[in-house]
A protein has these predicted regions:
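Ser/Thr/Pro/Gly-rich low-complexity, intrinsically disordered segments
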Residues: 259-261, 274-277, 290, 294
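Flavin-dependent oxidoreductase catalytic cores
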Residues: 1-241, 245, 250, 257, ...
Length: 305
């Protein structure tokens, strides 16, 4: 979810889904070590429960990332072993680490030694020609022996040579049964399925076989899908239909005095907001002109279907 689930996006999604676990964009351990880690890790308290997803293969740097993430109050530290991009591979992390399970296990142990916050792993079902249940099971067993008890499994193999990251999200076939088998064989572990979930009916079916589902692209293509899940089954939880009053959107886009407007904008709200309401975050005049009593319908119209 690079370039999508930053803290502004997560705040917005939390308005729609009070109960979902939210995940950050992948933040590299090297960036946390060398960069302005406070700017990378800060988040609003309303985002809880929220997980920090870290990328890396150096146990010492990953341990530092876990320690700093825990200090900032994250509810979970997740290791990305699923991203197939060339850039990530060149840094020796992401999906390519499925071929080096002991390295991932070393990171799990080092991170757990630094914090009591749960350390989890997000992975694929395989990579390239290593596309068998036995390969996935062995990888998970090694991480479990290191102490990891929660796995988020994207039910596609990652093709590291020949497919782009975008193609890797759709071209390899979904193999849900492989994830279901993992849960049957390791019932003591928490297994979350990811990949291709676009309907409430799919969620119901998948939850008969695993402990949870992770929603990725569907959450930014149709954020209100999360609100539908919150209210399913009917009566479980209610989300206010006018949750996105203009006065709630203004803080998301308000430019801090020392922060460029581009940092706040990017593309987070574009799929669901009216272009007339926030014209590409072009300046304060548009935002200050918003009056909740006059603009509420503009906010609600794209969302209430």
């Amino acid at each position: 979810m690079m370039d999508w689930t930053d803290r502004h996006c997560r705040y917005f999604l939390r308005l729609l889904s009070p109960g979902a676990m939210l995940y950050t964009e992948m933040v590299t351990a090297a960036a946390i070590h060398h960069g302005d880690y406070a700017a990378l890790l800060e988040f609003d308290a309303s985002e809880h429960p929220v997980a920090l997803q870290a990328g890396g293969s150096d146990p010492a740097l990953m341990a530092e990332a876990a320690r700093r993430g825990a200090r900032f109050g994250y509810d979970e530290i997740n290791i990305n072993v699923g991203c197939p991009s060339d850039r990530v591979q060149s840094g020796q992390f992401g999906a390519c680490l499925m071929a080096r399970p002991e390295v991932v296990a070393d990171c799990v142990r080092a991170m757990q030694a630094e914090t009591d916050v749960p350390v989890t792993v997000k992975t694929r079902i395989g990579i390239d020609d290593e596309d068998s249940y036995a390969f996935l099971k062995e990888f998970v067993d090694i991480q479990n022996e290191a102490g990891c008890q929660k796995f988020i499994v994207h039910a596609r193999v990652a093709i590291l040579e020949g497919l782009s990251p975008r193609e890797n999200r759709s071209v390899p076939p979904l193999k849900y049964e492989r994830v279901f088998q993992l849960k049957r064989d390791l019932p003591e572990l928490e297994i979350i399925l990811n990949g291709g979930i676009t309907t409430v009916e799919q969620v119901d079916e998948v939850l008969e076989n695993v402990d949870g589902v992770m929603i990725g692209r569907q959450a930014y293509h149709d954020p209100y899908f999360l609100a539908h899940l919150e209210q399913h089954p009917p009566g479980v939880r209610q989300v206010e239909p006018d949750v996105l009053h203009a006065h709630e959107v203004k803080p998301l886009a308000k430019k801090p005095p020392d922060q460029p407007i581009e940092v706040v904008g990017r593309r987070k709200l574009a799929p669901v907001t009216d272009a007339a309401m926030i014209p590409r975050y072009s300046g304060h005049n548009h935002l200050d002109a918003l009056d909740p009593s006059e603009n509420r319908d503009q906010v609600r119209e794209p969302l209430v279907r």
